[in-house]
Design a protein with these regions (language model features):
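Conserved glycine-rich cofactor-binding loop
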Residues: 17-19
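Substrate-binding pocket helix/loop in short-chain dehydrogenase/reductase
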Residues: 97-98, 102-110
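Active-site helix of classical SDR
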Residues: 121, 155, 163
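Residue(s) in the substrate-gating loop at a strand-loop-helix junction
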Residues: 139
Length: 182
């Protein structure tokens, strides 16, 4: 028996075309959500939206590109008006010792894992309903020491702190903020 916990709810899964984001998107769809998924690669995104089925829309968005985030906000507002759940799973992993990290590698990971998340939330905030939820994809690396991945660990610790700060900021707005750290 299907419970349809998200029937009539508008759910945006950023990074919903692969990995944990795709799994979450499928689960939201199975529970009846009006689903929006994003990703960088148009072909993959379209294929995964078809695979998910249901009421799934797909928009290209690279969270490291501020203009693409702004475009996403406009598209979501035009098609859906508001969102009930913002699930951000877009992220990257990179390992290596501190001596192997380049400035480009640092910027790429921080831009994808933390900066893009922050500015996606900032852009979507006016579209968040009351009540609504924001779920951020963290990592156990943001809580525990992980050898050979200092930049990744730092970015995911930032996600954890961002979630805690926003949870405190948004409590009076009816927006719940959580981080999931597999």
């Amino acid at each position: 028996m299907t419970r349809n916990l998200f029937e009539g709810k508008n759910v945006l899964v950023v990074g919903g075309n692969s990995g944990i984001g795709l799994a979450a998107a499928k689960a939201f769809s199975q529970e009846g959500a009006n689903l929006i998924i994003t990703g960088r690669n148009v072909e993959t995104l379209t294929s995964k939206a078809d695979e998910i089925g249901g009421r799934t829309s797909a928009y290209q968005c690279d969270v490291t590109d501020m203009e693409q985030i702004k475009d996403l906000v406009v598209k979501v507002e035009l098609e859906f008006g508001y969102i009930d759940v913002l699930f951000i799973s877009a992220g990257q992993y990179s390992s290596g010792s501190i001596n192997s990290v380049t400035e480009e590698n640092w910027d790429w990971l921080m831009d994808t894992n933390l900066k893009g998340m922050f500015f996606t939330i900032q852009g979507m905030l006016p579209l968040m309903g009351n009540p609504s939820s924001i779920v951020l994809m963290g990592s156990i690396a943001g809580r525990l020491a992980v050898a050979e991945s200092p930049v990744y660990a730092a970015s995911k610790a930032g996600v954890r702190s961002l979630a805690r700060s926003l949870a405190a900021d948004f409590v009076t707005k009816g927006i719940r903020v959580n981080v999931v750290s597999p």
